[in-house]
Design a protein with these regions (language model features):
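Short acidic alpha-helix initiation/capping motifs at coil-to-helix transition points
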Residues: 95-100, 124-127
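Rossmann-like NAD(P)-binding element
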Residues: 1-16
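An alpha-helix initiation/capping motif
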Residues: 90-98, 119
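N-terminal alpha-helical segment
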Residues: 49-53, 100-101, 174
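Rossmann-fold dinucleotide-binding core
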Residues: 16-85, 94
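NAD(P)-dependent Rossmann-like dehydrogenase/reductase catalytic/cofactor-binding core
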Residues: 61, 65-68, 75-88, 105, ...
Length: 190
């Protein structure tokens, strides 16, 4: 909030402001930007040189013309523009990815299997290039700890189906296991 409050007076009024967060909703900050009609999100996936997607999400006050300009901008910089028409934590990619990662973590934290076997089950079973723990190593353990803690503490982020599938105590177990690894400087691979 403070960042936007300090930045807003320094920018010309024509300036469009975009955040790259896929966790925070633009509506949470729009009023602090001094230009809510020109404030929205432009979220890039990791490794944009090969996974060149850009999720564009406005908020209730975003001018539709500004939204369209940002979609066009994403196309101009050779991204695959993915318009998100309604605010949603996680946007498109992470709304699908996070439950997948949490499912892998649940299998590990419950003692069902080890990270390598879980990754092999996924990669060989689906043809995907990476399993959940390889992806966690890519995004970083600090991000994984943050995700687990957020999903543990914010009601409504986790779908009812996934809540039923996972034992509730596992969020605390997952968080502790990941934090211990982070504190030791460990990763799942390498």
């Amino acid at each position: 909030v403070e960042f936007y409050q300090k930045m807003a007076p320094l920018l010309p009024t024509k300036t469009v402001i975009a955040t790259n967060s896929s966790t925070l909703l633009p509506s949470q900050f729009a009023k602090y930007t001094g230009r809510p009609k020109k404030y929205l999100s432009l979220h890039f996936a990791n490794s944009i040189w090969k996974n060149n997607t850009a999720e564009i999400m406005g908020q209730a006050q975003t001018d539709p013309a500004v939204f369209d300009q940002l979609v066009e901008f994403a196309n101009q910089i050779r991204m695959i523009a993915l318009p998100v028409r309604k605010e949603k934590n996680g946007y498109l990619l992470n709304s699908m990815l996070v439950p997948f990662l949490l499912s892998g973590l649940d299998l590990w934290a419950s003692g069902v299997s080890d990270p390598k076997s879980i990754d092999i089950a996924w990669t060989h079973g689906t043809g995907a290039p990476k399993g959940p723990f390889q992806i966690i190593d890519t995004v970083g353990l600090a991000t994984a700890v943050s995700i687990v803690n957020q999903y543990q503490s914010v009601p409504g982020l986790l779908s009812p189906l996934l809540k039923k599938m996972m034992m509730p105590y596992n969020f605390k177990t997952m968080s502790k296991l990941l934090q211990d690894m982070l504190d030791k400087g460990e990763k799942f691979y390498g």
